């Protein structure tokens, strides 16, 4: 049985259980009509054997018994990261917090200014529309009333 998680999967799987599962899969696949398969299924099934030959992930890449020089570089980097997190972050976190809050307030102020400007434009447009309608009604009282009557008759 091939395993994908060698440190987690139990290598001592009962062979009878594995055979039973394979038998169930074959039984289900045999019950399906073969004309229902996609034309690429046989090619993919044939390629499955090639996957086992490729070997999967190269575990040697993660082996720590490698080049001593490289291990020293990695150790130095990890030590630097640990010191940075332990020593410097605790001293600078308050300043980082203040700077972040200032940026957030600045962005919020810019957004609010844009919203206020748009609201002012909408209010001015509404006032203009109201003034135009009032002026038109004063200069054309018969037309406006007739239009309103037609609309009322249409919807009532």
UniProtKB/Swiss-Prot annotation:
Keyword list, A-Z: mRNA processing, mRNA splicing, Nucleus, Spliceosome
A Gene Ontology annotation in the biological process aspect, one of them, is: RNA splicing
The UniProt entry lists the main location of this chain as nucleus
**In its keyword annotation, does this UniProt entry include Nucleus?**
yes
Give the record's GO CC terms.
spliceosomal complex
Q: Where does the record say this protein resides?
A: Nucleus
Record keyword Electron transport present: no
Q: How does it assemble?
A: Associated with the spliceosome.
Q: What does this protein do?
A: Involved in pre-mRNA splicing.
Q: What is this protein called?
A: Pre-mRNA-splicing factor SNT309
Organism from which the protein derives: Candida glabrata (strain ATCC 2001 / BCRC 20586 / JCM 3761 / NBRC 0622 / NRRL Y-65 / CBS 138) (Yeast)
* Gene name linked to the record: SNT309
């Amino acid at each position: 049985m091939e395993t994908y998680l060698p440190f987690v999967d139990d290598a001592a799987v009962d062979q009878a259980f594995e055979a039973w599962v394979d038998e169930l899969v074959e039984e289900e696949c045999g019950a399906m009509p073969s004309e229902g398969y996609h034309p690429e299924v046989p090619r993919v099934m044939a390629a499955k054997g090639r996957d086992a030959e490729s070997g999967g992930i190269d575990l040697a890449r993660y082996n720590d018994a490698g080049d001593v020089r490289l291990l020293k570089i990695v150790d130095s980097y990890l030590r630097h990261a640990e010191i940075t997190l332990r020593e410097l972050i605790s001293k600078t976190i308050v300043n980082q917090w203040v700077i972040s809050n200032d940026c957030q307030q600045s962005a919020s102020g810019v957004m609010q200014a844009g919203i206020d400007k748009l609201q002012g434009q909408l209010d001015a447009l509404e006032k203009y529309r109201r003034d135009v309608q009032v002026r038109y009604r004063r200069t054309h009282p018969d037309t406006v009333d007739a239009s309103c009557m037609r609309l009322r008759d249409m919807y009532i």
